[in-house]
Amino acid sequence: MKHRHLLIPLIAVMTCCGVCLAQESPDPAAKAPASIDAASKLKNTPVPSAGTGKELGDFKSGKHTMTSAGLEREYIIDIPENYDKDKPCRLVFAMHMMGGSMQTMVDNKFYGLKTYAEKDKIPVIFVAPQGYTDSSPWRGRDDKDHIFFADMLKLFKEKLAVDTSRVFCCGFSFGAMVSYSLSLDFQDDLRAVACYAPANWNIYLPENKHKPLAFYSTTGTEDGLCKYVNSDARKEGGKYCVLTHIEDNGLTELPEIPLATTPTHVTTEFKGLPEEYPVVFGSFVGGHTDTAKDPGSDVNWISKETWDFFMRF
């Protein structure tokens, strides 16, 4: 895997291994950093929700229903075995893809993130909401999924020991599309979002609040469904999902984004951004998938990089 740090401007130096190192020069493309509150600093002290210290009662792992925006909605919540009511923990929303469901998220360990949480003994509450309340996996013409997300988040904060400064969202395909949509509207609630093959069309998009948010994204160079570029004229495609957050996080001159040309994927982190609000993009030669492995590796690097990204905070 090639992991690049893109600096604007930069002086590149090639090592004998062919890895691009760089020395940073003053960056005229970066905005003056806004003040960052304590809850957004890296490795900040957890911010406990109102549910911290409360007994779980009958609110336990499993399938739940609630009424939201006039619709009966369902979700599955997974409260970890090492949950401690007095210690606020991370909360991760996993949004399913077309053809999938909330149960799919449970079956695939919430895009593999639960496997890493258990391995590292990190208590994480996982939530898999159910879409399919209209003709699409997630709603394309109104904000009812956004209201559903807000209602769930409010409920979980009231019932559970949630670290309100470490709420995350991830998804693949249509799940990435709704995750991206939420990333434009819930920057004050979401610490970071991970999108695997996102698209910024055929989905409800709110007016972007243009607030900073940590963002990780992947797109295959041969993806014909959620294309890296669907339309330059309309700024549609995974490329523009990345560029939107680069700009919202502080860069005024948008960079060229390196794309993979060999079977080994290329991950780029864009410099000139506050460390609290990184933007990272993983490119690979391949199609529409959330599972990708480099030659000779049995590790799904998308899941691994997502976990590492979320754990920065």
Predicted regions and their residues:
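Solvent-exposed loop/turn segments at secondary-structure junctions
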Residues: M97-S101, G131-S136, S173-M177, P198-N202, ...
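Active-site machinery of serine-nucleophile hydrolases
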Residues: L91, M95-E158, T261-F284
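Catalytic active-site module of serine/aspartate enzymes centered on a nucleophile-bearing elbow/loop
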Residues: D298-F313
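A domain-start/cap signature at the N-terminus of enzymes
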Residues: C20-L91, R141, C170-A194, P198-N200, ...
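Alpha/beta-hydrolase fold nucleophile elbow
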Residues: A161-S173
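Bacterial N-terminal signal peptides that target proteins for export
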Residues: M1-I8
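Bacterial N-terminal signal peptides
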Residues: I8-G18
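The feature captures the conserved acid-bearing segment of alpha/beta-hydrolase catalytic domains
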Residues: R191-G282, G286-T289
